[in-house]
């Protein structure tokens, strides 16, 4: 494997670490000879902001009859020190300061969820992702504070089970607040009736009940073409610019956050196989993945997300690995930007550049 590929993979590879599969030994930190944990802890404590403000994403999902707020804050921590105020800081910000940020009295009844992203300050290979389930309906500030306190405690305990106690982490915490006083849970008969009335798009596409989300997913999956079809494929040869390129596009619908949906598995397996099988790619090459997402509930939320331009790959195996990494990066980004249960129509395009003359400047211009 080429050196540039190894470097890229080590930096950008994304791993979801489960407590049942990893031991504390795996996560033992390497600080260097003669370096003590106290040094790093003091460095973290000194650099930690006294007041890390909550960032707010405005409410969205208007046509789905719901309001959803996303708040986030970032801090660093080291598990060794029980006296570390990190968890108290988080509990205070999401349990108390949130009331100063949003008028929660106007949001009750609501449901809450917390998501934690722990970045390893020593090795990005050990990054952790945790989240809570959406809470039961909360109708008061007292209930909200109690739920936050319990959720922070459970997450702390979970992290301590799978992380070495001297591990350095930078944590970003997200709290999603879902106002659901207008949320309705439809049974099958009601759904059928609404569909006959042509009001499918008015159904609330987020729901804390698995059955409702699965219902949408099953209908979408049943209509997909299998194997995945390449709906648009272009080969471009531009002699004056001295490079060749190809673009391959598919189009499918999927539901965010449903683990039973094979959408992403198909993208990373069948899609790549189809593209690679038809492409007469000449190595070395660079790649980029572009996804245009149409929100079937609210057109104002349509979005386009793109991967970075990959490092150069020199053979088929490197190409498969590189494309998989680029797609996984987009999955993480989309999960951060979209709450579970949203229905999207996605147009995914892989762009490949044949670097026959390794004209990097021209390639970047083409991809932007």
Curated annotation (Swiss-Prot):
Keywords: Glycoprotein, Signal
Glycosylated residues in this chain: 99, 170, 266, 295
Signal peptide residue numbers: 1-19
Protein name: Uncharacterized protein ORF83
Organism encoding this protein: Ostreid herpesvirus 1 (isolate France) (OsHV-1)
Lineage: Viruses, Duplodnaviria, Heunggongvirae, Peploviricota, Herviviricetes
